[in-house]
Design a protein with these regions (language model features):
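Acidic, Gly/Ser/Thr-rich repeat motifs that build Ca2+-stabilized beta-propeller blades
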Residues: 23-183, 231-234, 239-247, 299-337, ...
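Mobile, glycine-enriched helix-loop/loop "lid" segments at the mouths of ligand-binding/catalytic clefts
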Residues: 197, 255-286
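Blade/loop signatures of beta-propeller domains
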Residues: 23-38, 139-142, 204-214, 271-287, ...
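Conserved blade-ending motifs and adjacent loop-strand segments that build the rim/top face
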Residues: 341-362
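Bacterial N-terminal signal peptides that target proteins for export
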Residues: 1-10
Length: 385
């Protein structure tokens, strides 16, 4: 078993990450229920950025771009050339280079994990892949990149890759896999479509996964019945894994992921088809043997990356969950009593930008990526008296 470690604790520095003076001049203030908030550009000129990770000791950031580039962003906002050693991606539709996370032991092993759309399927179709490589000391690229997980079969013609990555307290890697817009596969246990999987950091399957040893069932599966999971985060207080996913037309969900559970898609949904017709397989908003959403939006905001806030800088945000929204172009703040959502606030709508990812930085600020041709990495914080 792994030594329990918290990556942010290992990387944390209370000092502010330095910002470009030119970009700091572009800071904008917006209202919120808890006082005004400031959004300050850290970096501009990103090509549809998808995810970010914080390097230790205030070195800067790694940012993925959908067309297939991994970039180093210095603390003052300078973008590197695309890093070498990144796998070739299938950059069509929603496919491309997707999530990035650092190893829990990054200071020792320098391993960077990437998820991406990979071609090679029958009829030119694609699926999600996950791999890892060692970040070069000069930050110029990844070395010895190896694939540790492939979604099989590959069924996507451009949609629903999922692909979020998160480590739990014990060092297991959780990966969300979309159903490739092939609804019934989310219920098929011989396929990796519409699943959350749990693996060791090197791709091996833990013996205590729920379906290990069952004939015809993929042993990597931890949960199933997911549609297109776009957010994944470790709850820092309970240690549980939380996931969010796109509904069809309506029915975006937040779920607490439990071992071996069925989360319903497409048998249960709060949404309908984009054609305005019912989902053919759906039995209603609930179905026997499935887990109801922990939180649901009847009108889809198009949720994306999410992060729990457990920093010390902004006490008013403590125990809140922040969720990016692509369609409504906002940052959603969810407030809890225990695990129950009791309040929701919409933030940053004035930016009029698709928010693809949100992460809590080691300095206690939130960092937000906008999914645009000229994407921006923002630092977001409350203005405190």
């Amino acid at each position: 078993m792994f030594v329990r470690k918290t990556l942010l604790a290992a990387l944390c520095a209370t000092a502010l990450l330095p910002l470009s003076a030119a970009y700091a001049a572009d800071s904008q203030q917006f209202p919120s229920e808890q006082g005004s908030i400031t959004a300050t550009p850290v970096a501009k000129g990103l090509d549809h950025p998808w995810a970010l990770a914080f390097l230790p000791d205030q070195q800067g950031f790694l940012v993925t771009e959908l067309p297939g580039h991994l970039r180093f962003v210095s603390p003052d906002g300078k973008l590197s050339a695309p890093l070498k050693g990144v796998p070739q991606v299938w950059a069509k539709g929603q496919g491309g280079l997707l999530d990035v996370v650092l190893s829990p032991d990054f200071k020792q092993d320098r391993l960077v994990y990437l998820s991406y759309a990979e071609g090679g399927g029958e009829g030119g179709k694609a699926g999600t892949a996950v791999g890892r490589g060692r970040l070069a000391a000069d930050l110029s690229g990844l070395e010895d990149f190896k694939v540790i997980l492939r979604q099989e079969p590959k069924l996507s013609t451009g949609n629903h890759f999922g692909s979020r990555l998160a480590f739990d307290r014990d060092g297991y890697l959780f990966v969300t896999l979309g159903e490739n817009n092939d609804r019934p596969t989310a219920q098929d246990l011989d396929k990796l479509q519409g699943k959350v999987v749990r693996i060791y950091p090197d791709g091996r399957v833990p013996d205590d996964n729920p379906f290990v040893g069952q004939p015809g069932v993929r042993p990597e599966i931890w949960s199933y019945g997911q549609r297109n999971p776009q957010g994944l985060a470790l709850n820092p207080w309970s240690g549980t894994i939380w996931e969010n996913e796109h509904g069809p037309r309506g029915g975006d969900e937040v779920n607490i992921i439990e071992r071996g559970k069925n989360y319903g898609w497409p048998l249960a949904t709060h949404g309908i088809n984009y054609s305005l017709l019912p989902i053919p397989e759906a039995k209603g908003k609930t179905a026997e043997g499935t887990v109801a959403p922990h939180h649901v939006w009847e009108k889809s905001p198009g949720i994306s990356g999410m992060a729990f806030y457990d920093g010390d800088r902004f006490n008013a945000w403590q125990h809140n969950l922040f969720v990016g929204a692509l369609v409504s172009q906002e940052l959603i703040r969810l407030q809890f009593e225990g695990d129950k959502v009791v309040h929701e606030e919409r933030l940053l709508g004035e930016l009029k930008a698709r928010i693809r990812d949100v992460r809590q930085g080691p300095d206690g600020f939130l960092y937000v990526l906008t999914d645009e041709d000229d994407g921006v990495l923002y630092r977001v914080g409350l203005n405190q008296d």
